C-alpha cells in the first residue's frame, strides 16, 4: 500500500482522506518515512529557506486561544508592548540580513493589527527593502484585503496565518474566532498576489484524523509552506 500510494503521488496524483488514514495506521513506519522522503526530494528537494521573525507587538491579545501566551486572558508574565520602535526593527532586520537569512517576518499579537500600526510597519518595511535583499513577511492576525494590500505595496509579499487544527477540533481550543475567519484572511492575501504560509500545532489533544483534515484543508487552499 505504501509503495502504491507513493507512486500515485510521485505521478501527480493526490491521496484521499481514507488513504491518508490507512497510511497513518501503517505498521511499517520506517517504510512510510522513506516514502515521504522520496516525495519530498522530488517535489521540493533538500534545500530550505531561513526565516527569522521580530516580535513586533507583544501581549494584550483579546483572543482566547488556549495554546498562546499572548492572550490577555491568561497569566503568562510575558513582556507587553504596543509596537517596537523603528530603530529596533531596522537593526534586527539588518543583523539577520548580515547572517544570510532569507526571510524576515513582522509578527504581532492581537486579533488584527490596527490601521495605525499597519502604517508604521509599512514605513519600516520600505526602509528595510531599501537596505537589504530580505523577503519580508507578516503575521498580523485576521486582516482584511485593503490592509493586506497596504503591506503588499510596502514590499511585504508573504502572509502567515495558521489554521492551527482541523475545523472540527478548533472550537475546543479557541472560541473567539473561527477557522472560517482564518480562511477569509488567507484567501484575501492570495487574491492580491501574496504568498501564504500556514500550518498548525501538533499535540494539543487532537486525533490523527484531525491532523489529516488539517493537512487536507491546507492542500485545498493551495498552501505550499
Language-model features: locations:
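Canonical radical SAM enzyme core domain
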Residues: 77-90, 113-158, 163-167, 181, ...
Amino acid at each position: 500500500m505504501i509503495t502504491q500510494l507513493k507512486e500515485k503521488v510521485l505521478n501527480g496524483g493526490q491521496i484521499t482522506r481514507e488513504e491518508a488514514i490507512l497510511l497513518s495506521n501503517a505498521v511499517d513506519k520506517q517504510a512510510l518515512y522513506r516514502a515521504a522522503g522520496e516525495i519530498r526530494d522530488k517535489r521540493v528537494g533538500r534545500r530550505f529557506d531561513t526565516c527569522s521573525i521580530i516580535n513586533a507587538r507583544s501581549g494584550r491579545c483579546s483572543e482566547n486561544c488556549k495554546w498562546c501566551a499572548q492572550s490577555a486572558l491568561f497569566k503568562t508574565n510575558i513582556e507587553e508592548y504596543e509596537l517596537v520602535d523603528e530603530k529596533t526593527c531596522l537593526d534586527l532586520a539588518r543583523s539577520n540580513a548580515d547572517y544570510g537569512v532569507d526571510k524576515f517576518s513582522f509578527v504581532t499579537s492581537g486579533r488584527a493589527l490596527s490601521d495605525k500600526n499597519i502604517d508604521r510597519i509599512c514605513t519600516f518595511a520600505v526602509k528595510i527593502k531599501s537596505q537589504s535583499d530580505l523577503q519580508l513577511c507578516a503575521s498580523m492576525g485576521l486582516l482584511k484585503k485593503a490592509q493586506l494590500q497596504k503591506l503588499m505595496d510596502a514590499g511585504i509579499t508573504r502572509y502567515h496565518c495558521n489554521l492551527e487544527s482541523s475545523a472540527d477540533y478548533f472550537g475546543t481550543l479557541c472560541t473567539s474566532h473561527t477557522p472560517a475567519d482564518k480562511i477569509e484572511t488567507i484567501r484575501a492575501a492570495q487574491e492580491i498576489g501574496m504568498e501564504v504560509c500556514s500550518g498548525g500545532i501538533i499535540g494539543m489533544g487532537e486525533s490523527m484524523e484531525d491532523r489529516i483534515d488539517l493537512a487536507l484543508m491546507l492542500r485545498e487552499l493551495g498552501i505550499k509552506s
